[in-house]
Design a protein with these regions (language model features):
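A short beta-loop-beta micro-motif enriched in histidine and acidic residues
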Residues: 49
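Left-handed beta-helix
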Residues: 15, 20-21, 26-27, 32-33, ...
Length: 177
């Protein structure tokens, strides 16, 4: 794995987390217990910080990045990802807040200042534009993402299932090392 410091700040990775050897984690990134970071993920906490909550999985090819302090973005935009979150393959999450128990679908993009509330599901390929507030308990799809309906019971259950499944999978990978 490529774990790199940026300036004087090194990533902090909890015991029991899994970072695949083909992933890149740079700078001010904190990865909590039971997190899994899969191949080709880039988590670049260079110009602001990234925090990833317990039991979250970041799937293959996803990009996690932040925005710096500037006149366009005073204070910049860090990236906060809660616990039990699934970030699907090739998603881009940039300078936003994703609360607990969310799913960000494959190839979805969540931009600066957006907030994805607990229990929300952002559909594959959707775009959450800067500053959008994504209400929890609903499916959001499209470009820009729009609330289309309440999550069904099976979808709500899947939020928990996905987090647990990826904890089990990363434990298999860890035991094979």
């Amino acid at each position: 794995m490529s774990i790199r410091k940026y300036n004087t700040i090194s990533p902090v990775i909890a015991a029991g987390a899994w970072v695949d050897e083909a992933a890149v984690v740079i700078g001010d990134v904190a990865i909590a217990e039971d997190v899994s970071i899969w191949p080709m993920v880039v988590a670049r906490g260079d110009v602001n910080w990234i925090r990833i909550g317990a039991r979250t999985n970041v799937q293959d090819g996803s990009v996690l990045h932040v925005s710096h302090d500037s006149s366009f973005a005073p204070g910049g935009y860090p990236l906060s990802i809660g616990a039990d979150v699934t970030i699907g393959h090739k998603a881009v999450v940039h300078g936003c807040t994703i609360e607990d128990r969310c799913l960000i679908g494959m190839s979805a993009t969540v931009m600066d200042g957006a907030v994805v509330r607990s229990g929300a599901m952002v559909g594959a390929g959707s775009l959450v534009p800067p500053g959008q507030d994504v209400e929890g308990g609903y499916l959001w799809v499209g470009t820009p993402a729009r609330r289309v309906r309440p999550l069904r019971e099976q979808e709500r259950d899947f939020l928990d299932y996905s987090a647990k499944h990826y904890v089990d999978l990363k434990n298999e990978y860890l035991s094979a090392c």
